[in-house]
Amino acid sequence: MSDAFGGYVCTSAAIDAAVASRSMLAHPFYQAWEEGALSADALKAYAKQYFHHVEAFPRAVSAVHANCPSAQGRRLLAENLAEEEGIGAGKDDHAALWLGFAAGMGADEAEVRASALNPETENLIETFRSLSRRSYASGLGALYAYESQLPAIAKTKIKGLVERYGVAEPRTLKFFEVHEEADIEHSDVCRELLDALPLSERADAHAAACELAEALRTFLTGMQRETGMAC
């Protein structure tokens, strides 16, 4: 185990290291956002593309939940899924929250839903779909590779929107505010479940996490291409 994962004993620690080397926050597109270098049109295009991933994401969580062999694990994942779907008093599903952000970027719901997916967006959605259904370990690794990055991403996105783009509308920021907090708990759940995997399944989780992290960065490269940003 330790040799296969560069000396890491815990699966989650090995995945953390792999994801850090494939960080979304280190991608030039997100760095440009943080610096205020993206145009309004680029942010609008991003809002339209990323919506399709946000809308598809609960189905990946559902597949991981369905494949989980542990009743306790299923309960924990069900709480994650309920959060994504907006189940509970006073909660909104996360696709609806994203539409609030898109509206703040100048794209109404009809425009967002009608937007054609670029190849990199299609690849991200299909990669997540495939990994979440391949096996429980694979889906869990992919889920962790995504959700473990979201609190830091959300924090920097809020900072960039407020300080660089003058965004003050609560509806525009709410998606990121929710994820800055909720995905700390979600990633903790995934970490606990990853480190409880049988030894024979840990390599699958690690490989899936690496594949999903690459697909996330490829999505951002697609946004560079679509918006004419130098790659």
Report each predicted region and the residues it spans.
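Non-heme di-metal
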Residues: S2-C231
